[in-house]
Amino acid sequence: MMTTRSCAEWCVERCQNAGQYARTALQAQLIAKRIELLSETVRKAQIVTLLVNPTNRYTDTETEILYGGARSLNLQLHVVRATSVAEFDAAFKEIKDLRTEALLVSADLFLHSQREKLVSLANSYALPTIYPWREYVTAGGLMSYGPSLIDASRLIGIYSGKILRGASPAELPVEQNTKVEFVINLKTAKAQGLAFSIPLLGRADEVIE
């Protein structure tokens, strides 16, 4: 019988790894869209940087996909790594030294846990940044494009409930978190001297003023 802890761990693993092909396909769509939105927002940008946690097992896949997206938009891409809060200041100094004009933050739970620090650093450098989840934007980040973490938590809760009621994990159907949100923070945009186009604003699911 599964314990509550092992049940939760299984649910997280299943939601994250429902199939490498499905996950990679969704990841490719999200990453491609993020760099496209960033390019639309900062039209003159030629140098972009991706901030990653190299201990995340999906970092190589994300980086490979993003290199392809950058090439298609005629952008030069750099990758900067940080595995701890202590490395953040040095990472942003490197980002600045690379003459980065726009930044993407990787979809990583450690980075997400430090979102207020990352947002503060990005804003202190007046660096247009797109993040993977809306929580960054409510913390003052410029914009985000990615799945709803609230919906992801709901799916985990549904799986947990079914298993605790006796369902076999192997027989449960795989469900994907399909809700994707594009969120913009106009206050941050104004502080950075950026103006979103009317069409881009119209595509946003939420605009924070």
Mark where each language-model region is.
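Short hydrophobic alpha-helices and adjacent helix-cap/hinge residues
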Residues: 1-209
